[in-house]
Amino acid sequence: MIARCLLAVRSLRRVGGSRILLRMTLGREVMSPLQAMSSYTVAGRNVLRWDLSPEQIKTRTEELIVQTKQVYDAVGMLGIEEVTYENCLQALADVEVKYIVERTMLDFPQHVSSDKEVRAASTEADKRLSRFDIEMSMRGDIFERIVHLQETCDLGKIKPEARRYLEKSIKMGKRNGLHLPEQVQNEIKSMKKRMSELCIDFNKNLNEDDTFLVFSKAELGALPDDFIDSLEKTDDDKYKITLKYPHYFPVMKKCCIPETRRRMEMAFNTRCKEENTIILQQLLPLRTKVAKLLGYSTHADFVLEMNTAKSTSRVTAFLDDLSQKLKPLGEAEREFILNLKKKECKDRGFEYDGKINAWDLYYYMTQTEELKYSIDQEFLKEYFPIEVVTEGLLNTYQELLGLSFEQMTDAHVWNKSVTLYTVKDKATGEVLGQFYLDLYPREGKYNHAACFGLQPGCLLPDGSRMMAVAALVVNFSQPVAGRPSLLRHDEVRTYFHEFGHVMHQICAQTDFARFSGTNVETDFVEVPSQMLENWVWDVDSLRRLSKHYKDGSPIADDLLEKLVASRLVNTGLLTLRQIVLSKVDQSLHTNTSLDAASEYAKYCSEILGVAATPGTNMPATFGHLAGGYDGQYYGYLWSEVFSMDMFYSCFKKEGIMNPEVGMKYRNLILKPGGSLDGMDMLHNFLKREPNQKAFLMSRGLHAP
């Protein structure tokens, strides 16, 4: 997705918090588990391990639960008049840090381990810990003491971020129903545990899906030889095509055989159809029930309360307004595509059915790009070998944000293809964090693109700072003999986007783990990474990112100009598809009696103008529904309003590699993490309220 990884976020939001300046007030019986946990939280070090066996994962999961619960119990047993900031809130915040770090080692391997048994153990650990998270987040004794603390402590004597932590803790307690009767609390708790398990299973099913189709060479017509040569062959000399991105999208964009594309699209949008449809049928009503018990009309209303949009009515108005503005552009693009199809069917002797099918869309959008801008992505990718792109990307971010990156030798990683880098502030030499790059597909690996926050950059109990650690997990094509991994331009854009999330994780400098990295409002979290996508649409920036893999020659200037100009190609249909997904997400979380497949089909016809293929159920493959974006997928478009405003008003005006603007962005947008509201950060950066002008221009629309 960003695709946003919510591993750390989930732990942070579900476990009320924790930290350890209760040394003066807690007894010796609590100190032992805290000391045991403290070995994992050391200032300036990456303490993560990736060599745990399934048995160790299981054992350490239970140990973590016992150790963390002891701290919560100690806080919960404090006499109400004994409660202080140090022995209550600070204590909870301290143990939260240790919990997150240890949990990462237990639940992250499900997404990246090459060992199926390790992945299974990690998934079970995630389920077990998620249930524990819910138990701890619904401790009435803890909530009572936090409320008492707010009522009695001198808020003027604690730092603003600590006040925010206190206020958020009480807000989350109420959103967990801790102000409601015990019977209702227990009902909510039971449903939340079930919801958590369903979400984990939904995405596990997608990650573990190993479906492939078999085609003859003739059925792969117009696909480049280097792609076909990279495919695994069957005993009868046919080719295996998986549904992973490096296989699926080249076929859908370049294969001239409609039946091949139809079979691929059908298989892609029926992945996990049976099991994930059942999960959605259970998950969506549970979310609604919990929301209603908490006093909200719908689940969408519940989640939006914490976002910058605030209400379903604002989201609906935004999506409907944008859809109407894009309608003429979408109609024109569909007409152009239909004419292309009609001509090609005549030229190739195919039957012309007079409509754009779901399996036609990517193919003819690719042809549109080639015809209107003379852009051949297969030719162009020869200038984007992954080593050159990576070097250019890292240099860009270093120069722009005042950082230096150093690749670590003999690094402890989860797969030999993974690399690890240390990040330092260029001016001071201070170590800010580390990041892993996991770039190639493997069996059982997370099959989209995401940044995973692994270790929070925050203060430790002794006042020192834990360095942030993140992982960029994507699935670019594997290198083959005589040729490195070559990236399409849209993959270069994905690389920049996800690395923007990595920089958010690393550059945030907060006191509390709960506010570290990308722990901002869900409809703001994409702002920093989307803003940095603009660098792959700039001629000078593209020169830094490209070089022919054979002779090192640069991309011709006229081709670069055409590539940049092609940014607006198909923008109507691409944006309308995002609106479709956003509307489906909103609908499913406002009216749970709806059938997901039917709702998707309805919006595809009404908004996109391209019918969904009968028999498919795209929502069953829609990982965002179970990955932390429930009721919030609109955030991709919503946050782009802000990201485009920042780019055009500052970077475009003052120079996209202007280090002063880059440091302003680092200090005002990245560094605060979630310690400030997203809208406050935007106002600090823009010195005004944000507007839609730049966003509409980026979509080829008139900005009033």
From Swiss-Prot:
<dbReference type="GO" id="GO:0046872">
    <property type="term" value="F:metal ion binding"/>
</dbReference>
<dbReference type="GO" id="GO:1902809">
    <property type="term" value="P:regulation of skeletal muscle fiber differentiation"/>
</dbReference>
<dbReference type="InterPro" id="IPR001567">
    <property type="entry name" value="Pept_M3A_M3B_dom"/>
</dbReference>
<dbReference type="InterPro" id="IPR045090">
    <property type="entry name" value="Pept_M3A_M3B"/>
</dbReference>
<dbReference type="Pfam" id="PF01432">
    <property type="entry name" value="Peptidase_M3"/>
</dbReference>
<keyword id="KW-0479">Metal-binding</keyword>
<keyword id="KW-0645">Protease</keyword>
<dbReference type="GO" id="GO:0006111">
    <property type="term" value="P:regulation of gluconeogenesis"/>
</dbReference>
<keyword id="KW-0496">Mitochondrion</keyword>
<comment type="similarity">
    <text>Belongs to the peptidase M3 family.</text>
</comment>
<dbReference type="GO" id="GO:0005886">
    <property type="term" value="C:plasma membrane"/>
</dbReference>
<dbReference type="GO" id="GO:0006518">
    <property type="term" value="P:peptide metabolic process"/>
</dbReference>
<dbReference type="GO" id="GO:0005758">
    <property type="term" value="C:mitochondrial intermembrane space"/>
</dbReference>
<keyword id="KW-0378">Hydrolase</keyword>
<keyword id="KW-0007">Acetylation</keyword>
<feature type="modified residue" description="N6-acetyllysine">
    <location>
        <position position="664"/>
    </location>
</feature>
<feature type="transit peptide" description="Mitochondrion">
    <location>
        <begin position="1"/>
        <end position="37"/>
    </location>
</feature>
<dbReference type="GO" id="GO:0042277">
    <property type="term" value="F:peptide binding"/>
</dbReference>
<dbReference type="GO" id="GO:0007186">
    <property type="term" value="P:G protein-coupled receptor signaling pathway"/>
</dbReference>
<keyword id="KW-0809">Transit peptide</keyword>
<dbReference type="GO" id="GO:0005739">
    <property type="term" value="C:mitochondrion"/>
</dbReference>
<dbReference type="InterPro" id="IPR024079">
    <property type="entry name" value="MetalloPept_cat_dom_sf"/>
</dbReference>
<comment type="function">
    <text>Hydrolyzes oligopeptides such as neurotensin, bradykinin and dynorphin A. Acts as a regulator of cannabinoid signaling pathway by mediating degradation of hemopressin, an antagonist peptide of the cannabinoid receptor CNR1.</text>
</comment>
<dbReference type="GO" id="GO:0006508">
    <property type="term" value="P:proteolysis"/>
</dbReference>
<protein>
    <recommendedName>
        <fullName>Neurolysin, mitochondrial</fullName>
        <ecNumber>3.4.24.16</ecNumber>
    </recommendedName>
</protein>
<dbReference type="InterPro" id="IPR024080">
    <property type="entry name" value="Neurolysin/TOP_N"/>
</dbReference>
<keyword id="KW-0862">Zinc</keyword>
<feature type="binding site">
    <location>
        <position position="504"/>
    </location>
    <ligand>
        <name>Zn(2+)</name>
    </ligand>
</feature>
<feature type="active site">
    <location>
        <position position="498"/>
    </location>
</feature>
<keyword id="KW-0482">Metalloprotease</keyword>
<dbReference type="GO" id="GO:0005576">
    <property type="term" value="C:extracellular region"/>
</dbReference>
<keyword id="KW-0963">Cytoplasm</keyword>
<feature type="binding site">
    <location>
        <position position="501"/>
    </location>
    <ligand>
        <name>Zn(2+)</name>
    </ligand>
</feature>
<feature type="binding site">
    <location>
        <position position="497"/>
    </location>
    <ligand>
        <name>Zn(2+)</name>
    </ligand>
</feature>
<dbReference type="GO" id="GO:0005829">
    <property type="term" value="C:cytosol"/>
</dbReference>
<dbReference type="InterPro" id="IPR024077">
    <property type="entry name" value="Neurolysin/TOP_dom2"/>
</dbReference>
<dbReference type="GO" id="GO:0004222">
    <property type="term" value="F:metalloendopeptidase activity"/>
</dbReference>
